[in-house]
UniProtKB/Swiss-Prot annotation:
Gene giving rise to this polypeptide: mtlD
Top-level division of the source organism's lineage: Bacteria
Species per Swiss-Prot/TrEMBL record: Lactococcus lactis subsp. cremoris (strain MG1363)
Amino acids binding NAD(+): 4-15
GO biological process, alphabetically ordered: mannitol catabolic process
Similarity comment: family membership: Belongs to the mannitol dehydrogenase family.
Keywords for this protein: NAD, Oxidoreductase
Annotated protein name in UniProt: Mannitol-1-phosphate 5-dehydrogenase
Xref: SUPFAM superfamilies: 6-phosphogluconate dehydrogenase C-terminal domain-like (SSF48179), NAD(P)-binding Rossmann-fold domains (SSF51735)
InterPro entries: 6-PGluconate_DH-like_C_sf, 6PGD_dom2, Mannitol_1_phos_5_DH, Mannitol_DH, Mannitol_DH_C, Mannitol_DH_CS, Mannitol_DH_N, NAD(P)-bd_dom_sf
Catalytic activity: D-mannitol 1-phosphate + NAD(+) = beta-D-fructose 6-phosphate + NADH + H(+)
Gene3D superfamilies: N-(1-d-carboxylethyl)-l-norvaline Dehydrogenase, domain 2, NAD(P)-binding Rossmann-like Domain
Pfam families xref list: Mannitol_dh, Mannitol_dh_C
EC numbers for this chain: 1.1.1.17
An example molecular function term from Gene Ontology annotations: mannitol-1-phosphate 5-dehydrogenase activity
Length: 388
């Protein structure tokens, strides 16, 4: 039986990547530091996924195991050495922390003279996630290790899309997900061409698809979250009932369409993107998915990053002389976002009260364009004054 090592036994790992790998006949070794979940996986070797729709169904995933990388790092290294595929769903910020283990797994494959090619795929909400992980892994490799990596280890980038809300169940392993899911892998970067995963789309050029996803789903979800937080709503579903919030989402979507059509006219049409964006609205409005605003809005500093879901579209729209006022408005709401249980929100509010705004904008967003920095400063002041 083929073996998969998956870093991250959380809701996305179990409720999306695990489902696809299981359907493709893999034994799955989930790697995580959550002792309770790892122990439960090793006790039961199976779990259920609930599909949240008007016709609910349950999917059983079996042939699963858990490895606690905090307690048993050697077992992780051995699992990577024996794996046919390695995947991650741990969050962009955590990728550097698994790099050394992945490197040791690659070194063990080399020591055992394994000449079977393997792909390591970061399934994260970021552009170039697998390439980023490869760079971090390479920091732990010798020159001869790097030669082996170049020949036998692929790091194809991927785009993943499925809404998995925050949730708690009596059953530790049970997870509810929306019906829709999309996993796209850059075919040009694949090393192991002996199989293709069913349920996965392979693209010769991933970039247009990952930008469509990040600038539509992630930007859109965040638009609803920060707009809802500003109005005092607790869930995404509640917020979307408000005309102003739906209008804000549609405004961001309109600007996103303009950018995607300007960048990728050979891949998308206005009609395609309109249909895609309407589908996204219906996904966000799924009455069976109760998604907390605090979950979608968490880590605001990360979401204000230079290549993230708002600043990158703003930069690229500005370069093309296209409007980005709706994106800009949400940036103001992100700076105004307050959640005492979110360390980044607390940190951002502290900086707002102590730092010069323009210097703070430069620090958080990485922007150097004075025009955009000034525009962001004005929208920060607007929402700061409104909240008083």
């Amino acid at each position: 039986m083929k073996k998969a090592v998956h870093f991250g036994a959380g809701n996305i790992g179990r409720g999306f990547i695990g489902e696809i790998l299981s359907k493709n006949g893999f034994e799955i070794y989930f790697v995580d530091t959550n002792k309770a979940i790892i122990d439960e996986l090793n006790t039961r070797h199976s779990y259920e996924i609930g599909i949240a729709s008007s016709s609910p169904e349950k999917i059983s995933v079996s042939g699963v195991f858990g490895i606690n990388n905090g307690e048993n790092p050697k077992d992780v290294i051995e699992a990577i050495a024996q794996a046919d595929i390695v995947t991650t769903a741990i969050g962009p910020n955590i990728l550097p922390y698994i790099a050394e283990l992945v490197a040791k797994g690659i070194q063990k494959r080399k020591e055992e003279n394994k000449q079977v090619q393997i792909d390591i795929i970061a399934c994260e909400n970021m552009i170039g996630g697998s390439e980023f992980l490869e760079k971090k892994v390479a920091e732990y490799l010798s020159d001869s290790d790097k030669v082996y990596l170049a020949n036998y280890i692929g790091f194809p980038n991927a785009a993943v899309d499925r809404i998995v809300p925050g949730q708690k169940h009596e059953d530790l392993l049970y997870v509810e997900v929306e019906p829709f899911c999309e996993w796209v892998i850059d075919e040009s970067q694949i090393k192991n061409k002996s199989f293709k995963l069913e349920g996965v789309h392979y693209a010769s050029n991933l970039e247009p698809f990952i930008e469509r996803k990040l600038f539509s789903v992630n930007s859109g979800h965040a638009t609803v979250a920060y707009s809802s937080a500003y109005k005092g709503y607790k869930t995404i579903l509640e917020g979307l009932q408000h005309k102003e919030i739906l209008s804000a989402l549609k405004g961001v979507q309109k600007e996103t369409r303009a950018l995607l059509l300007a960048k990728w006219p050979q891949y998308f049409t206005e009609e395609d993107l309109m249909s895609y964006h309407q589908m996204i609205i219906s996904r966000f409005a799924n009455p069976k998915i109760i998604d907390e605003v605090t979950r979608v809005a968490r880590t605001p500093i990360r979401k204000l990053g230079y290549d993230e879901r708002f600043i990158r579209p703003i930069r690229e729209l500005n370069e093309r002389g296209l409007s980005y006022q709706n994106h800009l408005d949400i940036v103001g709401k992100i700076f105004a976002y307050q959640d005492e249980n979110d360390s980044q929100s607390v940190q951002l509010q502290e900086k707002l009260s102590t730092m010069d705004f323009q210097r703070l904008i430069e620090e958080v967003t990485g922007l150097s364009n004075k025009k955009i920095i000034l525009e962001i400063e004005l929208v920060i002041k607007k929402y700061k004054n409104d909240s008083k």
